[in-house]
């Protein structure tokens, strides 16, 4: 009797796996405990966002961006607003820019807190998520006090932001900053020199810089491999060029370096937030939070009570929407997960002709086979945790 040739064992990872971070399904080919092939299956959260946007006005298209990376919603709104403003050829007032940057950095904290703590949970540490979610709750309240919503804020608007921030909110965000740095130190105390955490992350999924560029990585995935590439410094938008902050980079490009980069990025985000809060209190930080052009931004309720023209402009804006000059533009922002880009094509009507969304997580997940091949089965969850993927933007 001829002995059958040994063949690899195929298993499903997800889509209901707690370490899958959403509806991820991986088909893993195993040789014993060693992973020989990884086949990601996506599309379980596909909602046709890009097509839906083509049938909406520019204002109606905005809430779809909250639902992409739903961990840090305002960062995605930012890209769409900047793209539309570029086509309209408008600049927004200084106060509006500062508020946008402040809330983008709050979004970065929200995203990194979730990622770092759940990455720890994926390798067996249960305390960090409890501490991290306590801080996220405070940040969610800041979202709620600005926009009325904890998650899907719809706060950034074309031309600025929806409404000004109350001064008490600015004080409370300031009071949050320094104690939060202590929480970062506590989290590092739990994880950075933790023997088990290091054994599970050091040397796992090392990415050389050339490979990172080749796979289309961005954000922490390239900074962890040693490139100081951050769109806030490389291609500054809004008022980032006036702010002082550093770009942390890794040395080895492994899971552990990516964790360290995210921890330091949270500290830099707090630095940026404090600078924004200081500038918002200065005389040059006062003024409107959105452009005064009522063809783009609706007039205030007070104006509508006084002026028939304001009433008409408000009605036209919410029924018909504003018309955007024909053209095409690509705008990218440094979202917490990497370079989030919006390629927007306008045909001169009140609806986008095409809106292509460049999701950073999509490029990172596509390299899952490259990153995981040759590692152990137990390393798969550690690698997914260090990629920081979210399915809202991968499946769109």
Curated annotation (Swiss-Prot):
Compartments (UniProt record): Cell inner membrane
Enzyme Commission designation: 7.1.1.-
Class of this enzyme: translocase
Membrane topology term: Peripheral membrane protein
Keyword hit for rRNA processing: no
Cellular component GO terms, alphabetical: plasma membrane
Signal peptide residue numbers: none
Keyword Disulfide bond in record: no
Gene3D superfamilies in alphabetical order: Cytochrome-c3 Hydrogenase, chain B
UniProt keyword list: Cell inner membrane, Cell membrane, Membrane, NAD, Quinone, Translocase, Transport, Ubiquinone
InterPro entries: NADH_Q_OxRdtase_suD, NADH_UbQ_OxRdtase_49kDa_CS, NDH1_su_D/H, NiFe-Hase_large
An example Gene Ontology molecular-function term: NADH:ubiquinone reductase (non-electrogenic) activity
Catalysis: reaction(s): a quinone + NADH + 5 H(+)(in) = a quinol + NAD(+) + 4 H(+)(out)
Family as reported in the entry's similarity comment: Belongs to the complex I 49 kDa subunit family.
Function as written in the Swiss-Prot or TrEMBL entry: NDH-1 shuttles electrons from NADH, via FMN and iron-sulfur (Fe-S) centers, to quinones in the respiratory chain. The immediate electron acceptor for the enzyme in this species is believed to be ubiquinone. Couples the redox reaction to proton translocation (for every two electrons transferred, four hydrogen ions are translocated across the cytoplasmic membrane), and thus conserves the redox energy in a proton gradient.
Subunit-level organization: NDH-1 is composed of 14 different subunits. Subunits NuoB, C, D, E, F, and G constitute the peripheral sector of the complex.
Protein's name according to its UniProt entry: NADH-quinone oxidoreductase subunit D 1
Designated gene of the protein: nuoD1
């Amino acid at each position: 009797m001829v002995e059958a040739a040994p063949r690899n064992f195929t298993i499903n990872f997800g889509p209901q796996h707690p370490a899958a971070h959403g509806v991820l399904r991986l088909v893993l080919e195993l040789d014993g405990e060693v992973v020989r092939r990884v086949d990601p299956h996506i599309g379980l959260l596909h909602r046709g966002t890009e097509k839906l946007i083509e049938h909406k006005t520019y204002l109606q298209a905005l809430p779809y961006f909250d639902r992409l990376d739903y961990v840090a919603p305002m960062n995605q709104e930012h890209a769409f607003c900047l793209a539309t403003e570029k086509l309209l050829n408008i600049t927004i007032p200084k106060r509006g820019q500062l508020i946008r940057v402040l809330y983008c950095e709050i979004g970065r904290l929200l995203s990194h807190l979730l990622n770092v703590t759940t990455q720890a949970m994926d390798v067996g540490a249960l305390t960090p998520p409890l501490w991290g979610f306590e801080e996220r709750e405070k940040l969610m309240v800041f979202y709620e006090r600005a926009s009325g919503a904890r998650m899907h804020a719809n706060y950034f608007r074309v031309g600025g932001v929806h409404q000004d921030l109350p001064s008490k909110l600015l004080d409370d965000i300031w009071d949050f900053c320094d104690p939060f740095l202590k929480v970062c130190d506590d989290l590092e105390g739990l994880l950075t020199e933790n023997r088990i955490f290091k054994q599970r992350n050091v040397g796992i999924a090392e990415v050389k810089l050339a490979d990172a560029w080749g796979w289309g990585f961005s954000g922490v995935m390239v900074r962890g491999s040693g490139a100081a590439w951050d769109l806030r410094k490389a291609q500054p938008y809004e008022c980032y060029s006036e702010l002082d902050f550093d770009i942390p980079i890794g040395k080895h490009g492994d899971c552990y370096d990516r964790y360290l980069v995210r921890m330091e990025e949270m500290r830099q985000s707090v630095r940026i937030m404090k600078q924004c809060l200081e500038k918002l209190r200065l005389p040059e930080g006062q003024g409107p939070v959105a452009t005064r052009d009522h063809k783009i931004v609706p007039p205030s309720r007070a104006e509508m009570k006084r002026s028939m023209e304001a009433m008409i402009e408000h009605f036209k804006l919410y029924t018909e929407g504003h018309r955007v000059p024909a053209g095409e533009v690509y705008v990218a922002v440094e979202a917490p997960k990497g370079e989030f880009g919006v390629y927007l094509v306008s045909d001169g009507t009140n609806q986008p002709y095409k809106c292509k969304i460049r999701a950073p997580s999509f490029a990172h997940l596509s390299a899952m086979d490259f990153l995981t091949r040759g590692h152990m089965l137990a390393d798969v969850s550690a690698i997914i945790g260090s990629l920081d993927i979210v399915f809202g933007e991968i499946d769109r």
